[in-house]
Amino acid sequence: MSVGGKKMSRIEQEIHGIIDSLISDYDKDRPIDKMNNLGNQPDKEKITDIIDKLFKIMYPGYFRDRSHKVYDMRNYTTMLIEDVMYRLNQQIKTALRFSPENKEKEDTFFEDEAERLSVAFFKKIPEIRAYLNTDLQAAFDGDPAAYYKDEIILAYPGFYAITVNRIAHELFVLGVPMIPRIMTEHAHSLTGIDIHPGAIIGKYFFIDHGTGIVIGETTEIGEHVKIYQGVTCLLYTSDAA
């Protein structure tokens, strides 16, 4: 076999055969075959960056950029909020456009709804921080190996997963599509703790160790609850029961 007058080696022929087979497979019009998704879907890397910046807002004394000193907390917070709100707004807008139920909506809907949801989320941040403060206290009280609250914020995977979930839960409740799941699955990949953003979790929540914990969407957890590694809290389907 030759291409452009040049004889192909055996491995080149095999590669061309594989390519032909794959191109044919792409034409089957299945969900996994979509070609027009790039640029139209939420960006996981950008959402991860939003999480990192939200940690700077939730815990201003722990995750700030150390390359410069903050002389005016109000100015610093203003710049950070404006930056994160813009980035979140863009990702929410993309997620709304990507959702099948919105395919008939006008462009103005996506602009207005993304702005409304972004503002609504940021207004909830003081409430989220109030919950996180109780979670921090629960971890400190519940773990005799925790000598300082600082180490819980900086080092505990369970506290990281809880923080991400508190953020994602508010977005989920507001009706933001996809982004809450991307956030919690990012935390899951880092910590081994899988919390669905739809789960309802009360104050003073502590995850000890944490690896292998699964908390499903329908789960409701009250206040002052401590969960150890390897625990599953979810509703099984009748087929799985």
Set out the residue ranges of the language-model regions.
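Terminal amphipathic alpha-helical/low-complexity segments used for targeting or macromolecular assembly
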Residues: 1-182
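Generic structural "secondary-structure junction" signal
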Residues: 154-156, 197, 235
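A short glycine-/small-residue-rich loop at the edge of a beta-strand within enzyme catalytic domains
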Residues: 158, 174, 178, 196, ...
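Double-stranded beta-helix
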Residues: 167, 185, 232-234
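Membrane-interfacial amphipathic helices and adjacent loop/beta segments
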Residues: 177-180, 184-193
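A structural motif detector for beta-strand N-caps
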Residues: 187, 193, 199-207, 211-213, ...
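Conserved small/polar residues in nucleotide/adenosyl-binding loops
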Residues: 236-241
